[in-house]
Amino acid sequence: MADSAFVRAGSGAWRATRLTRGPWDPGHQHAGPPSALVARQVLAAAAPMGLAHLARLTVNLLRPIPIAELSISVNTDYAGRGAAHFSFSIGAQDKEVARGTALVQREAPLALPEGLPGHPLPKAPKPPAESSPGQFPFASKDPGYSDLVETRVADGAMFRGPCAIWFRLRHPIVAGEAPLPAERVAVAADSGNGISAILDFRKYLFVNTDLTINLLRPPKGEWVCIQAQTLFGPDSSGLAESRIYDEEGLIGRATQSLVVRAR
């Protein structure tokens, strides 16, 4: 089995391993690993500007992402003193497979007044140490995303509606490189629609066509909790909403727009 999601394959290129395999097709990636990889590249582009906080990441999934070599380009659309806007593109097999935008802000300590409504921020239902081990229903003998991450159930149950699941990387996103906090969030956040599914994935497709993550701060530690629910509209559309926590409390939110079809 591979020991990372991606291996560097030259300047601006990464070879995906089988640990990126998703639930819908054995030749396609789960969108979590490439979203994590692009978060890494956006932060690398922002670092020379002194910007380090990934406040927002939006990934528009144009087509299935193959388990193949990926190329990523990042452009600076605007850079100010306190924040910069970036756009990016992910390519594979001579096609653009995803594109998106990101906002990276400058970190600066700020003392807030006591007693603000809604604060202190809420915590996850249970810490990972008190949560039971989880298992994806699409796990199989073939390596895939379910082998890339370890999961623990803090509330509810996987694929049975609203739930809260802790995620921890078993392997790095890029071979030989320590995972960034933003990568830990992105690789987990794309699972919101899966863990909170209310339709049988053997009978229905409910694939997300995008992923937007908004962060108050980076996570601390290895564990990230996704507290998710899935909602469906009347015309083959859906929405997965997630709260994102680390062991200290709420750190952000994520949304996914879903296309729903009978198999």
Locate predicted features:
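Terminal targeting signals and extreme-terminal segments of soluble enzymes
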Residues: 1-263
